[in-house]
Amino acid sequence: MLFRSNIKYTFQVVEDENINAFATMGGFVYVNTGLIKAADNEAQLAGVIGHEIGHITGRHSIQHIKQAAIAQGASSLLGVDPDQIVQIGVQVALTLPNSRQDEYDADRRGLTTMMQTGYAPSAMPEFMKKLISGKSAPEFLSSHPAVTERVANLQRMIPASYRNRTDGLNASSYKQSLRSFF
């Protein structure tokens, strides 16, 4: 399932110059202004948003909570203070990156969503390549699986019939639309 129709999605722009985006349970997607500015075009931004929605539709946060609950149950059997384990679980959820499998799954879901909505799917791996080739890669990429491997996987997933799409790649139109905000 690429889209969960039972969820009301909420998108928030965070005034932060760091290049980052993240999703939480309940359909909340947060995109930093730094990421919006770093994108060359609408399709690149759509790729990031599609990836974050992929985490929601993949129920990745729910899996992390289930794992924490299992760990808490095991700790009770071992006589560890449950309050201490809950605190550790919250800290782990906030600081550890999504699993490698979750990232690949969110990439696949995001790329598929891009193709279904008409955006040029090439923008997703191109944005990742742009970010890792910059002066300093964004912090969120350093906590994700090997980006070069993800780029290669994304490029392989794009069907030949979609490789020449240009929808959403107009950089000047994108930058013009941002002028009133930034």
Q: For each of these PLM feature ranges, what is it?
A:
Residues 1-182:
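A Zn2+-metalloprotease active-site environment signal
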